[in-house]
Amino acid sequence: MNNLTVIARENCIYCRLAIRLLEEKGLKFELLMLGVDFEREEFQSLAPGAKTFPQILVNGVSIGGYEDLLEKVDSIC
């Protein structure tokens, strides 16, 4: 089973879509919210090179954002 993490922020439609997709697929994941679980300064240490939200991590490695998740979700299951 893969370890999934969603790095998200409030008022982000793609963050909500990613969370909904994972929930609909019945996948368990850790949710890290900007301003609650980490601060903006920590974002790069969580997802090096990332510039947008959400960031989806599979086993600690970023696979990208929502569009990337859509392409890869079936292989993650």
Segments predicted by a language model, with ranges:
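Thioredoxin-like thiol-disulfide oxidoreductase module
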Residues: 33-50
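Non-catalytic interaction surface on structured domains
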Residues: 19, 28-30, 45, 71-76
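Short alpha-helical
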Residues: 13, 38, 64
